[in-house]
From Swiss-Prot:
Name this polypeptide is given: BURP domain-containing protein 9
Signal peptide range in chain numbering: 1-29
Residues with glycosylation annotation: 321, 332, 470
Swiss-Prot/TrEMBL keywords: Glycoprotein, Signal
Domain of life the protein comes from: Eukaryota
Organism: Oryza sativa subsp. japonica
Residue ranges constituting the BURP domain according to the UniProt record: 292-507
Pfam families: BURP
Length: 515
């Protein structure tokens, strides 16, 4: 017999609502309701097809099956066609903390809300809400953790979550055998998330702790990614700010074995670190090839196609009696960001990158590296690194906006005396001036003047170029070898310094100069 389409279910529903409202305004304590209303034509006691069905349980419900000590509420409309997938229906569940069903909702709060458009198992075109507490004990993917999902109405696919807001938060106790063992993991997608693969037009943030044990690419290391909204390609990460830091214990069989690796890309340009010649497989876009050249290219009259990167506006340089009272450590990064708030996203990234670089100053090939956070500490670094107080400071004459990649003619190139033992200090992005200083070995410094061979620009004078004389122990994956098509040890490697650097060289004493 087919269920009737009359107003009976609606009338019963309204009667129950009236009873509930009336009970709330009477002196009767703890009203008990256990009401069942079936449409006249209910054909089957199991699947409730083609009928209206309505249950209300209070806390005292003592059924020995699925609904002990809980309130449970179902509302199906007339078109409910299947008890499994609940197509073309409204369905509402609410479980108390005391829910003790042996199935999938043990010891947790679970709230589902489906709108009329719920069509199948992937919950397309619906609102969906999950909340698991830490005691959730399901054998699936949510063991011993807090997990939170929020999908908006535009959710179009349960796999890639396009055009939606999505939020994950895992606590340290996450014990799933998948990709998140013993780690904290945090995702934040904005409304513009359009693709699971490349994450264009979105903010994305990953943080892995040292205990990350996945057999993939992040073994025994700290890894930090930060993408801004302009991220345009998941492969080369051009036009983004991206930050990597690998510990020496990195054990991946790929390109980062047993080394420290530090990359920092600035938005829209291939900025740093062209000076980190011993630090692994640095990936630069094709435009970076003009950063490098050979020492022979510095001969006067030679044609040189090169570029010099832009520099930041200079920040203030503190004295030691001021800087010593300001925390300077990654463990205090929250306090530092608060102290200098409000800070832009770019500055926040720079603070983190600077702190990481200054806390991991281990270099290769005998180089020394230190950071200076004050005028006095910079002088201390210079003296301790070069072993003398007789020093000369040189600053590049490159313009703040840098030098574009064009065809230039070398007007002059003068070697700087004693530059075989030099100290290069690079201005870091920080609320006040911080220098990262290191001592590259076997170098030769040149003061260079260039004349544009294309645009008729005036003479560019006072440039500083460094040539590394021995590249035999450089990493084979360095971009210099890739772009210049040479092998380690075959030739010298040269590049210009940007305006934000200071180069220090020792000055011979009078006695040494007369010998």
């Amino acid at each position: 017999m087919k269920a009737t389409g009359g107003p009976l279910p609606l009338i019963l529903f309204l009667l129950i609502i009236i009873v509930l409202i009336t009970a709330q305004h009477t002196a009767i304590a703890k009203p008990f309701f256990s009401l069942n209303a079936f449409a006249q034509g209910q054909p089957n006691d199991k699947d409730d097809q083609n009928m209206g069905k309505f249950y209300v349980y209070n806390k005292a419900q003592t059924n020995n099956y699925a609904d002990q000590r809980m309130r449970k509420f179902y509302l199906y409309n007339k078109d409910q066609a299947n008890d499994w997938d609940d197509q073309k229906m409204e369905k509402f569940y609410l479980y108390h903390e005391g829910k003790t069903n042996d199935r999938d909702d043990q010891k947790r709060k679970n709230i589902y809300l489906y709108n009329e458009g719920h069509a199948n198992g992937d919950d397309q075109t619906m609102e969906k809400f999950y909340l698991f507490n830490k005691d959730q004990a399901k054998d699936g993917d949510d063991q011993k953790m807090g997990k939170f999902y929020l999908y908006n109405k535009d959710q179009a696919n349960d796999w890639d979550d396009q055009k939606m807001e999505r939020f994950y938060l895992y606590n340290k106790g996450h014990a799933n055998e998948g990709d998140d063992q013993t780690m904290e993991k945090f995702y934040l997608y904005n409304k513009g998330h359009a693709n699971e693969e490349d994450d264009q037009t979105m903010e994305k943030f990953y943080l892995y702790n040292k205990g990350q044990a996945k057999d993939g690419d992040d073994q025994k290391m700290e890894k930090n990614y930060l993408y801004n909204k302009d991220q345009a390609n998941d492969w080369d990460d051009q036009k983004i700010e991206k930050f990597y830091l690998y510990h020496e214990g990195k054990a991946n069989y790929r390109d980062d074995q047993n080394m420290e690796k530090f990359y920092l890309y600035k938005k829209g340009e291939e900025h740093k670190y062209i000076h980190s010649h011993g630090h692994g497989h640095v990936h630069f876009p094709e435009g970076a090839k003009d950063l490098y050249f050979f020492e022979d290219n510095l001969a006067p009259g030679s044609v040189l196609i090169t570029r010099i990167l832009s520099a930041r506006q200079s920040s203030i340089f503190l004295h030691r009696n001021n800087s010593k009272h300001i925390p300077f450590s990654m463990k205090n990064i929250t306090d530092i960001l608060t102290m200098f708030s409000p800070v832009s996203a770019t500055m926040a990234d720079g603070i983190a990158a600077t702190l990481q670089a200054c806390e991991h100053t281990g270099m290769v090939h005998g180089e020394k590296a230190k950071c200076a956070t004050s005028i006095e500490s910079l002088l201390d670094v210079v003296v301790s690194s070069l072993g003398t107080k007789l020093v000369r400071a040189l600053t590049p004459g490159a313009p703040m906006e840098g030098v574009p990649s064009l065809r230039y003619i070398v007007a002059s190139a003068t070697p700087v005396p004693n530059s075989q033992s030099m100290l290069a200090c690079h201005d870091m992005l920080y609320p006040y001036k911080v220098f990262f200083c290191h001592t590259p070995k076997q170098t030769r410094l040149y003061q260079v003047s260039l004349v544009s061979g294309e645009s008729g620009r005036p003479l560019i004078d006072g440039l500083l170029a460094v040539c590394h004389q021995n590249t035999s122990d450089w990493d084979t994956g360095h971009p210099f070898f890739h772009f210049m098509d040479v092998k380690p040890g075959e030739t010298t490697a040269c590049h210009f310094f940007g305006r934000g650097s200071i180069i220090w060289v020792p000055v011979p004493s009078v006695k040494e100069a007369t010998q």
